[in-house]
Amino acid sequence: MTIIRKSHPLMKLINHAFIDLPAPSNISGWWNFGSLLGVCLIIQISTGLFLSMHYTSDTLTAFSSVSHICRDVNYGWLIRYMHANGASLFFICLYFHIGRGIYYGSYLYKETWNIGIILLLMGMATGFMGYVLPWGQMSFWGATVITNLLSAIPYIGSEMVEWIWGGFSVDKATLTRFFAFHFILPFIIAEMAMVHLLFLHETGSNNPLGIMSDSDKIPFHSYYSLKDLLRVVALLAFYLTIGFFFPDALGDPDNNTSANPLNTPPHIKLEWYSLLAYAILRSIPNKLGXVIXLVFSILVLALFPLLHTSNQRGXMFRPISQTLFWLLISDLIILTWIGGQPVEPPFIIIGQLASIFYFSNILILLPVAGLIENKLLKW
């Protein structure tokens, strides 16, 4: 078996990536979320494939087809709720994964980090289009509001919106193309994840101390493969608990009503994992300014390698940066909460202050903290 593992062209690739891969001996559970994301992606592709066999991307029958899946298809309700809650689970793991990268300075592997940002954008686009497919009330109005933001682009905005809609409003053509893109994007994400892994294995994994670990490596299997397996079991237990006992906890009640273009909901809300960017969008009264802030709220992650001023890689031994990091996490939780609230006082001013702090923390406070910590170390 060992000879085949190390000589067969296909097995050799798997061996180098998952078996004999040299890994730092001190990486913690925070390095586990990459493999959990892989598990989530496999679950999403598998359940999505079965759902697509029964779903119809037509405005007249989309809502009924989702109802049919839940009522008439064997275990259709389970597949539907696994897919819906699997998206939330995917983003929970994704945000933990990004948070670990920021805290421990993994963003200094620039190629791996930038591909990760592309994966985040593709994941958010896939999640948004999936949110539209059940053709509930919030699906329709969410699609209308978000796609209409492109009209803020000078000169070509209005034409772009009509081009995406396939007409003069969100209708059958929009739903059909959203279904097509929602089906193909997870496979592209899987391909990009392989490229992400390829670049990661060029440099090797970072570790909590942020130091070179070439002299102290251990094989990935069986040390970390079993460690990952334990957390996969824990993830699946949590996943099935949500799916069986609280299937609608992370959804919107308005989506249990079929889409009605003549009845606008009092408050248009996206899925929880998009709410922090949505809150930043709403905090700026100008339409173009808000769209710029929305895009920049994600792309600002690409500036982390350029704004790294500390002589140390991670924030393990940097108390000022640690404090700012946890303030940033608190700020993101506040933005997520604000994104789910109506646009009225006091939520408007809270959202604006949280948005200002988000950008100022990343662009000003964290780099300044790194410089201060460098000075303190020389005393």
From Swiss-Prot:
Keywords attached to this Swiss-Prot or TrEMBL record, sorted alphabetically, are:
Electron transport, Heme, Iron, Membrane, Metal-binding, Mitochondrion, Mitochondrion inner membrane, Respiratory chain, Transmembrane, Transmembrane helix, Transport, Ubiquinone
Role: Component of the ubiquinol-cytochrome c reductase complex (complex III or cytochrome b-c1 complex) that is part of the mitochondrial respiratory chain. The b-c1 complex mediates electron transfer from ubiquinol to cytochrome c. Contributes to the generation of a proton gradient across the mitochondrial membrane that is then used for ATP synthesis.
Sites where the protein binds heme b b566: 97, 196
Q: Name one GO molecular function term.
A: metal ion binding
Where, per UniProt, does this protein localize? Mitochondrion inner membrane
PROSITE patterns tied to this protein: CYTB_CTER (PS51003), CYTB_NTER (PS51002)
PANTHER family listed in its UniProt record: CYTOCHROME B
Primary location recorded for the protein, binned into one broad class: mitochondrion
Among InterPro entries, the record links this protein to: Cyt_b/b6_C (IPR005798), Cyt_b/b6_C_sf (IPR036150), Cyt_b/b6_N (IPR005797), Cytb/b6-like_sf (IPR027387), Cytochrome_b (IPR030689), Cytochrome_b_C_euk/bac (IPR048260), Cytochrome_b_N_euk/bac (IPR048259), Di-haem_cyt_TM (IPR016174)
Positions of a ubiquinone binding: 201
Name the family the entry cites.
Belongs to the cytochrome b family.
Q: What are the names of the required cofactors?
A: heme b
One GO BP annotation of this record: mitochondrial electron transport, ubiquinol to cytochrome c
Misc note: Heme 1 (or BL or b562) is low-potential and absorbs at about 562 nm, and heme 2 (or BH or b566) is high-potential and absorbs at about 566 nm.
On subunit structure and binding partners, the annotation says: The cytochrome bc1 complex contains 11 subunits: 3 respiratory subunits (MT-CYB, CYC1 and UQCRFS1), 2 core proteins (UQCRC1 and UQCRC2) and 6 low-molecular weight proteins (UQCRH/QCR6, UQCRB/QCR7, UQCRQ/QCR8, UQCR10/QCR9, UQCR11/QCR10 and a cleavage product of UQCRFS1). This cytochrome bc1 complex then forms a dimer.
Query: Which positions are annotated as binding heme b b562?
Result: 83, 182
Q: What is this protein called?
A: Cytochrome b
**Gene Ontology CC: one annotated term:** mitochondrial inner membrane
Keyword Transmembrane helix in record = yes
In the record's cofactor note, how is the cofactor described as bound?
A: Binds 2 heme b groups non-covalently.
Transmembrane intervals: 33-53, 77-98, 113-133, 178-198, 226-246, 288-308, 320-340, 347-367
Q: Which Pfam families does the record match to this protein?
A: Cytochrom_B_C, Cytochrome_B
Regarding the membrane, this protein is recorded as: Multi-pass membrane protein
Domain of life here? Eukaryota
Q: Which organism is it from?
A: Perognathus flavescens
